[in-house]
Amino acid sequence: MKSLALLLSLLINFSIGSYINFIPYDNSDCTGAINGGGWSILEYACFSIDVRYNYQFTTHTLNGEGFVQWTQFPRVVGKTQCFYQDLPISNASIGSCYKNNPLSTFDIFRSLPSNQYYLISVTSEPFYPTNQAGMIVLQYMGNGECSNDNVEIMQYFTNNTQSEDGITGIQMKWYCNDENEPYETQCFNGKNCFDMPQQYKCSPTHPFFNTSDEISGGTGAGDYSGTGSGSSSGNSGTSDGGSSGSGSGSGSGAFISIIDQNDKNNNKNNNKNKNNNNNNNNYNQYEKSTGDGGITKPHDNYISSFCT
């Protein structure tokens, strides 16, 4: 499939890992130009973008066919936890063209149209289209570090992508103007529209580092760090899992809360005394189902942050 050939166009080296990709198209064949809002999500990462639900993705093989599955977890206030509790599981075959629906709306503040489709793929590197002008890319990094080795989630919009705030109903269009400056058009009930400059970048090859303190989310030890939806910047998390950033414009802040499910040696050392200090309990443990029905050992988790 021609669309899959685009996966070979990555120009940046990333750390090795499995990323589940939701590559957007405007037709049920997932052919032609990539168009809409897409995702590239690290396998096993427990995350919440809008602080309403938590999600976790895994890959599996059944009868020789590969597929991805994900679970939507109810979110406890102040906690990002993904425990298996007999919850409904969504799935899609790798290489299939998957129709957008409420269970694939991972950011309610930027809900995408129901007529959008996703090409489902799995790669060892995070994917986003590098051959399109006017890309707006949001990156979420692991372990509080903004570097190539910590990319956990990528959320991107092609030029003129339309979305809607699922809470307020405000319609939004993301675009880059003739001067290659990022903007968001907001409309109320299809009228009273106005343009808002954004502090993201318009670039087909987005840099994976924090470009400005003014537009970065906090990297504190709190439960989550915030990012501005408009011109406002997010506040740093606090040691007791305190505040998050909220954006201007639509009034709905863009949040991020990720817990990495990888087994990190430095986290093991840092968390040796967690049982003796409940106030610093910024991690939980999980049990990951293996492909053959077994259970792997628990892994340490750690808080991630947003970078632009």
From Swiss-Prot:
InterPro entries in alphabetical order: CfaA/B/C
Top-level division of the source organism's lineage: Eukaryota
Biased composition (Gly residues): 217-231, 239-252
Biased composition (Low complexity): 267-284
Disordered: region residues: 213-308
Region forming the signal peptide: 1-17
Annotated coiled-coil segments of the chain: none
Record keywords, A-Z: Glycoprotein, Secreted, Signal
Glycosylation sites: 13, 91, 159, 210
Primary location: secreted
GO cellular component labels: extracellular region
Compartments (UniProt record): Secreted
PANTHER family from the UniProt entry: CARBOHYDRATE BINDING DOMAIN-CONTAINING PROTEIN-RELATED, TRANSMEMBRANE PROTEIN
Record's protein name: Uncharacterized protein DDB_G0290387
Source organism (scientific name): Dictyostelium discoideum
